Amino acid sequence: MIAVLRMLNRGRSRAERVRARLVAAGAAVATFLVCTAVSLADYKDEGGSLTGLGLALLAVPIGGLVHQANRLASATRERRLAALRLAGATPGDVRRLGAMEGGSLAVGGSLGGGALYVVTHLAGPLPQVPVVVALVTLGGVLSGARAGRHVVASPLGVARRARVRGPRVRDLLLLAAGVGLFVLGAVKKGDFPLAGPYGSAVSVAAGLVLLLFGVTLTTTWMIRGYARWAGRRARSAEALLAARLVEADPRAWARALAVVSLTVFFGAAAGAQQAGVGYSQGHALLDVALLVALATSAVALVVHQAEELIDLRRSFAALAASGVPERALGGVLVRQAVIAALPVCVVAAVSGVAVVVLTLTDVYQVQWLGWAVARAVAMAGVGVLAAVLVALAARPLLRGALVFETRA
């Protein structure tokens, strides 16, 4: 199995090599940030806790960027795995090869990030380093094992045309568990029942991870429902087409907007907290982390737009050939972004304020709600604006897809 993996690595394309470097670098940066965030759990002051939370938040968009890097050359990887299946490899062999490939990249990057943390924190706590390295490596193994899930079912590509999976009721449980762990760790802090401050940090980190997946799965409900509502009330062909396209595949939009929704959620929650305690250096670092998360989510949206244009290029080319102007097709992209992002950002902003207010019900004052609501509205607007700007920036991709399909 190792010999086969080495042979496949020697035959990797340039896109595959770029993807491998991005995955390893992302694993290294995520390991360093999480180790640093856990080490700050020892500080009793509010600034240290907020700094640790900001660093933990920085690891979330980096994880999303690693996921998008895995998607950059997914078609090439699936062709290689499909060739192995046709050559006689079993589904288990394909899964093991994918797990070994993803695990090797993750363990190399996480060891590099752990070594960097040890060098820069010789006097700081070190017990969390092997735990974080193991968790990051495990994530790489699971991601690699899932890479060939299409070709395991059908090496000829039949599974790629399967019906898009819709939202499920059990997706809500994941979101509830994430909110519960995050609130528990944030409220208890140093008095956490298990392992004290380290247990609190682990609870917050686990809550963030579950929130990331829970928001991705749960927002599918909101996006599909709002798209259906917008389609029934559409007053133009552009709005109707955009609503129907979003309704046809809400999970893809939920996946692309996951980091955006988390950015809006934590931005609104931070604003609700600032209204009571004032603005500190820890809040400044938290805002920087949110800006980085928003920029990273914009990259994820660009990748999503490119993938969608590749899938819909024939339909768009047929519309263009029938006389629909390119500007109108670009308007469809913008309307899609608004339909998908608006409900997600609004619900995320309201949820962020609600979590803080409900957690601090005994001490929270009514006059603080003014700043909290203003910050929530601003964060929701920034999230929708980011999606719209990405859609406007994707118009050259639309033009290229139309030209390519016309020549073909």
Predicted regions and their residues:
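A general structural motif at alpha-helix termini
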Residues: 98-99, 155, 333, 402
